[in-house]
Regions:
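Glycan-recognition and catalytic cores of secretory/periplasmic carbohydrate-active enzymes
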Residues: 1-201
Length: 201
């Protein structure tokens, strides 16, 4: 279909232009609207243009896992596996696997975490574990993330105000949504729980 072709073209161009040699990604690619050539590469919500913004890495892992699920194209599976390797072998990933908001923030370990990046990553890993020969490791990482979120990042019952998890970071460079609950963190937490349940049934 037309939409399928558009999605595949978008995925391929993103794989080509968003990612660095180490499989970390930029946040925003500025394309020339006439030629389609890349004009600039930015990391708008990260620490710096060449840094690895944590939620951006999580989106990449999630996105290419979904691309493989929908197409069966093993290039997308490889991309997802390489992004996972970047994340989980990064020297600035904390031992509880809940990332700082940007892997290259020089204020680490004093910089805020981003629980939303962790929940997106966990949900992606559960899905990826069903397709990859590294699935056992991916599920183990996802389980560790979910256990630590449940034990250390839940909003107390009497303070929830509609949220499940605290300590997400939306847009630190703009000074907004820093170390707070964010609704999409809760969404991907619930999605991850459902995927975990389905895997274990």
């Amino acid at each position: 279909s037309t939409f399928y072709k558009i999605a595949v073209t978008h995925a391929d161009n993103t794989m080509k232009n968003h990612f660095r040699k180490d499989y970390s990604s930029y946040h925003v690619i500025d394309y020339d609207t006439i030629t389609g050539n890349v004009r600039n590469k930015h990391t708008h919500q990260g620490y710096a243009h060449e840094s690895a913004w944590a939620r951006g890495q999580a989106w990449g892992l999630y996105g290419y896992t979904m691309c493989f699920r929908e197409t069966g194209d093993r290039r997308y599976l490889n991309q997802a596996e390489q992004i996972a390797s970047f994340i989980f072998h990064h020297p600035n990933l904390p031992s509880d696997l809940i990332p700082y908001w940007d892997y290259n923030d020089p204020e680490i370990p004093a910089s805020p975490r981003d629980v939303s990046a962790a929940t997106i990553t966990a949900s992606a890993l559960y899905e990826l574990s069903a397709y990859s020969d590294k699935g056992g490791q991916y599920k183990k990482w996802a389980d560790t993330i979910m256990e630590n979120l449940t034990e250390s990042y839940r909003v107390p019952l009497n303070q929830m105000h509609g949220f499940l998890l605290h300590s997400s970071t939306g847009h630190k460079p703009a000074g907004t949504e820093i170390d707070v609950p964010i609704v999409y963190a809760d969404y991907y937490f619930l999605e991850a729980l459902l995927r975990k349940k389905n895997l274990e049934e």
